[in-house]
Amino acid sequence: QLPAYKEGVEQVVRGANFISVEDPSFIGDYVPDFKALYAPMLYRSFDEYVKLTQSDLVADMRAKAEEQGIKILALHYIYGFRNLITQKVIKTPADLKGMKIRTPGSKSYIDTLSAMGAVATPLPWGETLSAVQQGVVDGLEGSEFTNIGTKVYEGPTKNVANTRHILGTCGVYISTKVWSEIPEKYQAIIQDEFSKGEHHMVELLKSQHGGVVKELESHGVKFNEVDGEAFRDALKPLYVEQEGMTPGVFQAIFTALDAMR
């Protein structure tokens, strides 16, 4: 999966006549600060993330992306917080020890689940449900919308631990070269429509989430809270500045989020 996702961003960087819809963390290959922006367990709500994407801090990241040939049209097509979906109740990192949890092929997901205590097991989504049924993996992670939309609940994984370890979101990108060739009046229309779409997506998720949880519960799914502090402590090694990141970028993100709370 990972090469396919990265290929979309690479096409944009190469100047292809192409719009890419990908996890914004992949922009981190070109602007490392984006990896910090999508580190695990940063956000408590959709609104926190949306406000941060509208800040001067992220405006600077967007400008750096444009220097790399990436025009960002949207950053918050959110599809929900990702939680653990397993057969047994998970409350602490210790409960995950030895458990094989399916992840996407992204390194950030693999590193996150590994730090949380699981044996991260990358699998294509098409193989995931059969792998759960056959016991190849002990569970998976994803949002309630994924759970209901793909009928994960019909399998043996009936427990959802509300880890909220990653905020699932997509961004929309186009080559700066291609963008510059679009007349300004149409640029304004395109940008406005993507911005409206972002807002609509967030409001839709907020309005539907409670109903989705109730529907999952009607199918026998049980939800439980976790020791958030224990998981955050386990994930601290991932809050380390990597090569190319702006010095202090994690602290700047933490400070901005603290100011919202």
Task: List each model region and its residues.
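N-terminal secretory/targeting leader peptides
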Residues: Q1-E48, D56-L57, A63-R261
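Short beta-strand-centered segments that line the small-molecule binding cleft or hinge
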Residues: K51
